[in-house]
C-alpha cells in the first residue's frame, strides 16, 4: 500500500515470507524503490516488552528477534528505525514458539487493537516530525 502526503510517499509492506525470512522481502523492496536504510521503519512484536508497551529506536541489534536478524543480514546494516510492540512472554521459556503463534486473550486483543490504531500516528510522527519526537511521545507507554 502506498500513502502520499505533501511531498512524501509512504510505502507500507507486509512481507508474505516466513518471519525469519523477512529480510529477503525488505531488501527487494528497498532495492527496487531505492530506499535508504534510515528511511526504513520496521514494526515488529517483542517478547521483552509487556503487552501494549511501545519502544521506538533509531538503530540497534536484533535483540534475538529472528525477523529483525534476517533484515539486518539481508540489507547489510542495522540503520533502520524500529517500532517494537510488546506482546509479553510466556511463563516458561520452552513455550515461546507456541506463545508467539497463539491468539491474544480478549483483554490483550483490546490493547493490541489500540496499538494498531495508534500505529499511523507513530509513523506520521516519525516521518513528518522527528524520530526524537516519536520516541518522547510514544516510548514506554502501555496502551
Residue ranges and their predicted role:
Residues 61:
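Short-chain dehydrogenase/reductase
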Amino acid at each position: 500500500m502506498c500513502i502520499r502526503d505533501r511531498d512524501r510517499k509512504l510505502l507500507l509492506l507486509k512481507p508474505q515470507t516466513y518471519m525469519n525470512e523477512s529480510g529477503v522481502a525488505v531488501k527487494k523492496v528497498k532495492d527496487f524503490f531505492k530506499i535508504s536504510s534510515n528511511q526504513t521503519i520496521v514494526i515488529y512484536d517483542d517478547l521483552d516488552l509487556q503487552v501494549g508497551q511501545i519502544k521506538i529506536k533509531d538503530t540497534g541489534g536484533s535483540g534475538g528477534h529472528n525477523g529483525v536478524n534476517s533484515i539486518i543480514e539481508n540489507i547489510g546494516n542495522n540503520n533502520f528505525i524500529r517500532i517494537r510492540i510488546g506482546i509479553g512472554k510466556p511463563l516458561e521459556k520452552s513455550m515461546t514458539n507456541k506463545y508467539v503463534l497463539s491468539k491474544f486473550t480478549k483483554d490483550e486483543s483490546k490493547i493490541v487493537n489500540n496499538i494498531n490504531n495508534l500505529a499511523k500516528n507513530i509513523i506520521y510522527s516519525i516521518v513528518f516530525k522527528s524520530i526524537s519526537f516519536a520516541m518522547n511521545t510514544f516510548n514506554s507507554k502501555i496502551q
